[in-house]
């Protein structure tokens, strides 16, 4: 019997590209304020680079396009990481989480810089919906998913057995392998923004697949039969 549902954050509860473009907006505003470019031109440059190149090349391409910028690469990274993000949950997910919380214990495990991930959670206004949030990089980047540590910590905190937990995430390589390795059940929700690399989208044996979280209540009803 499932007692707890543990969620991933990025591209599971909200579209990660919203955070990415929100960060680019913040960098564009700062760059324009310091001089050397127009806000919209800077943002368009970064957005185009995001779709055409590796994400690590976005800021260098901006600096190449506007050589008169009064910002260093370090300045851009700092503004991007420290900005207050303009992001929102996928439609219908706020009420879904509230309903699930009436019958299940809810948790979250998320990778990434803890300050950035905490900023996302605050911006989404969802911290109070979860009994426990594990920011894996609090314990070292090497312990991010699929390392067993964040999953074991969640189970220990909630004091439940692995088979009583369902982990929901978009990335089978990180979420799926970590959850299954910890003995949890795993449900994969299709990533809809394309931020995750395509190679991680292959299914894992034993995973439960769904198009979006709005299908989760029905899956929970069917789960005893699915797991037989």
Residue ranges and their predicted role:
Residues 110:
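Conserved phosphate-coupling serine/threonine residues in phosphotransfer and NTP-handling enzymes
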Residues 2-95, 115:
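N-terminal helical cap/lid subdomain that shapes the substrate entry/recognition surface
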